[in-house]
């Protein structure tokens, strides 16, 4: 299996540090608003990477953080006259509603920056002790000139980075590229005690601390959006490798940009969509399919016309599943004849083609093409006279491969009636009260598989069919 490593700019054989365990960190959202479809592309892509690694037999420790203290969160809190904690908690909840809707699996850990202040302070102390950071007026900065490999991820030297960087002039910094590790408190802003005075962490340090705390000093995969290569990921490498003296991540994965109607997504231009806006109009799996129909490193263009095309494509797959499920109820359970054995072999070949596509840098576009070939072959070769054993085999293989892409075709059937749904919700509430989070999550996942989405609100649990 090969993946493209931003660090080397080449496709490399994937060999995790530990034979059957993959430690993967994905930069999560800054929680001050609903996630937009650009965010969603990254989360869908890396959820799919995780699913395929699990399909291949790896145990994936998947960590995705929440940045829950930030200038944008502070601004939103001031506008709404609430605390930053209230803003963050609201939009973390909204994130999970959208993520569950899109079939994005929960991370092994979803750490929040504000819950790791002590860890962050200890990390900064290491950098100061090693001579990589300096303190000015309660602010702590990382001294980029001290880190000789600065620029290795973006493949630029310090002079090129300085020339291309849009960096505010700051008299406190020794170098314009130096970045803040700890920000001194400003009036009216939340702050925590530190050896340098009251303040809060810088953005870059949060990810270094949370990733290494839960996954170790060297990760297998660190992933995120294209805009994070510089400065965020570059700075993460600098501070992590300066602190620990070993490679921060073996592989770096970045998605391509997402444009809207051939222009960069921008709120001011009005060409901006939240996930919520799109999933209110389309089945969430249509958006998921749309995101995966292009290679993850390719830029993609989003428009409602293209979503209509994705909807038609999704319906073709949905119809194939519905047809196979119907045939299960009418076909006789007999052994395969010679022609059916040949058809079964053809589907074994399809499975191999799908895996080959995914083994080649997670080429979901080619993998989806294989699903369409499978649906076409099934529609033309399987009928009510076919062996039930063959139908079961084809349906099983089709659903397993679709599941790697996060497609469960929830629209095909909802076997649960309202009474059964309410009974399961009650069982989940009981599990939550008893702090049996595993059972509560299993019930939520089971309901989601049946096309039922739960929404925890202050008034209680709401549910809807999708």
Swiss-Prot record:
<feature type="binding site">
    <location>
        <position position="232"/>
    </location>
    <ligand>
        <name>Zn(2+)</name>
    </ligand>
</feature>
<dbReference type="InterPro" id="IPR032678">
    <property type="entry name" value="tRNA-synt_1_cat_dom"/>
</dbReference>
<protein>
    <recommendedName>
        <fullName>Cysteine--tRNA ligase</fullName>
        <ecNumber>6.1.1.16</ecNumber>
    </recommendedName>
</protein>
<feature type="binding site">
    <location>
        <position position="27"/>
    </location>
    <ligand>
        <name>Zn(2+)</name>
    </ligand>
</feature>
<dbReference type="InterPro" id="IPR009080">
    <property type="entry name" value="tRNAsynth_Ia_anticodon-bd"/>
</dbReference>
<keyword id="KW-0547">Nucleotide-binding</keyword>
<keyword id="KW-0479">Metal-binding</keyword>
<dbReference type="Pfam" id="PF09190">
    <property type="entry name" value="DALR_2"/>
</dbReference>
<feature type="binding site">
    <location>
        <position position="236"/>
    </location>
    <ligand>
        <name>Zn(2+)</name>
    </ligand>
</feature>
<keyword id="KW-0067">ATP-binding</keyword>
<dbReference type="InterPro" id="IPR024909">
    <property type="entry name" value="Cys-tRNA/MSH_ligase"/>
</dbReference>
<dbReference type="GO" id="GO:0005524">
    <property type="term" value="F:ATP binding"/>
</dbReference>
<dbReference type="InterPro" id="IPR015273">
    <property type="entry name" value="Cys-tRNA-synt_Ia_DALR"/>
</dbReference>
<feature type="binding site">
    <location>
        <position position="267"/>
    </location>
    <ligand>
        <name>ATP</name>
    </ligand>
</feature>
<feature type="short sequence motif" description="'HIGH' region">
    <location>
        <begin position="29"/>
        <end position="39"/>
    </location>
</feature>
<dbReference type="Pfam" id="PF01406">
    <property type="entry name" value="tRNA-synt_1e"/>
</dbReference>
<feature type="short sequence motif" description="'KMSKS' region">
    <location>
        <begin position="264"/>
        <end position="268"/>
    </location>
</feature>
<dbReference type="InterPro" id="IPR056411">
    <property type="entry name" value="CysS_C"/>
</dbReference>
<dbReference type="GO" id="GO:0004817">
    <property type="term" value="F:cysteine-tRNA ligase activity"/>
</dbReference>
<feature type="binding site">
    <location>
        <position position="207"/>
    </location>
    <ligand>
        <name>Zn(2+)</name>
    </ligand>
</feature>
<keyword id="KW-0862">Zinc</keyword>
<dbReference type="Pfam" id="PF23493">
    <property type="entry name" value="CysS_C"/>
</dbReference>
<keyword id="KW-0030">Aminoacyl-tRNA synthetase</keyword>
<comment type="subunit">
    <text>Monomer.</text>
</comment>
<keyword id="KW-0963">Cytoplasm</keyword>
<dbReference type="InterPro" id="IPR014729">
    <property type="entry name" value="Rossmann-like_a/b/a_fold"/>
</dbReference>
<keyword id="KW-0436">Ligase</keyword>
<dbReference type="GO" id="GO:0006423">
    <property type="term" value="P:cysteinyl-tRNA aminoacylation"/>
</dbReference>
<keyword id="KW-0648">Protein biosynthesis</keyword>
<dbReference type="InterPro" id="IPR015803">
    <property type="entry name" value="Cys-tRNA-ligase"/>
</dbReference>
<dbReference type="GO" id="GO:0008270">
    <property type="term" value="F:zinc ion binding"/>
</dbReference>
<comment type="similarity">
    <text>Belongs to the class-I aminoacyl-tRNA synthetase family.</text>
</comment>
<dbReference type="GO" id="GO:0005829">
    <property type="term" value="C:cytosol"/>
</dbReference>
């Amino acid at each position: 299996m090969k993946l493209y490593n931003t660090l080397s700019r080449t496709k490399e054989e994937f060999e995790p540090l530990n034979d059957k365990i993959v430690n993967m960190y994905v930069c999560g959202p800054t929680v001050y608003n609903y996630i937009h479809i650009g965010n969603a592309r990254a989360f869908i892509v890396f959820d799919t990477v995780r699913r395929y690694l699990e399909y291949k037999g790896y145990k994936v420790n998947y960590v995705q953080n929440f940045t829950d203290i930030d200038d944008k969160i502070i601004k939103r809190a001031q506008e709404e006259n609430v605390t930053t904690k209230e803003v963050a908690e609201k939009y973390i909840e909204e994130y999970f509603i959208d993520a569950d809707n899109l079939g994005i699996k929960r991370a092994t850990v979803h750490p929040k920056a504000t819950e790791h202040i002590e860890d962050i302070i200890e990390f900064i102390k290491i950098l100061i002790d090693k001579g990589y950071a300096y303190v000015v007026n309660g602010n702590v900065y990382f001294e980029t000139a001290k880190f000789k490999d600065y620029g290795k991820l973006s493949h630029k030297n310090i002079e090129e980075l300085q020339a291309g960087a849009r960096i505010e002039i700051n008299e406190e910094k020794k170098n314009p590229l130096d970045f803040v590790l700890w920000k001194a408190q400003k009036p009216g802003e939340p702050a925590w005690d530190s050896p340098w005075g009251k303040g809060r962490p810088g953005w870059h340090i949060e990810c270094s601390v949370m990733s290494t705390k839960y996954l170790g000093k060297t990760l297998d995969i660190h992933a995120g959006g294209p805009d994070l290569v510089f400065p965020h990921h570059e700075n993460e490498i600098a501070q992590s490798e300066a602190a620990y003296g070993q490679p921060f991540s073996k592989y770096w994965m970045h998605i391509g940009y997402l444009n809207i109607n051939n222009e960069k997504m921008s709120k001011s231009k009005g060409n901006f969509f939240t996930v919520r806006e799109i999933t209110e109009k389309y089945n969430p799996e249509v958006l998921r399919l749309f995101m995966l129909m292009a290679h993850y490193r390719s830029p993609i263009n989003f428009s409602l016309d293209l979503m209509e095309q994705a909807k038609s494509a999704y319906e073709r797959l949905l119809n194939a599943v519905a047809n196979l499920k119907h045939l299960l109820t009418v076909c006789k359970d007999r052994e395969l004849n010679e022609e059916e054995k040949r058809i079964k072999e053809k589907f074994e070949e399809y499975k191999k083609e799908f895996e080959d596509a995914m083994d080649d840098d997670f080429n979901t576009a080619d993998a989806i093409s294989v699903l369409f070939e499978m649906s076409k072959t099934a529609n033309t070769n399987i009928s009510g006279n076919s062996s039930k054993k063959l139908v079961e085999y084809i349906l099983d293989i089709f659903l397993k491969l679709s599941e790697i892409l996060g497609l469960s075709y929830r629209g095909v059937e909802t076997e649960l009636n309202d009474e059964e749904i309410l009974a399961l919700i009650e069982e989940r509430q009981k599990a939550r009260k008893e702090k049996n989070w595993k059972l509560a999550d299993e019930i939520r996942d089971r309901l989601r598989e049946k096309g039922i989405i739960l929404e925890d609100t202050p008034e209680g649990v709401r549910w809807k069919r999708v």
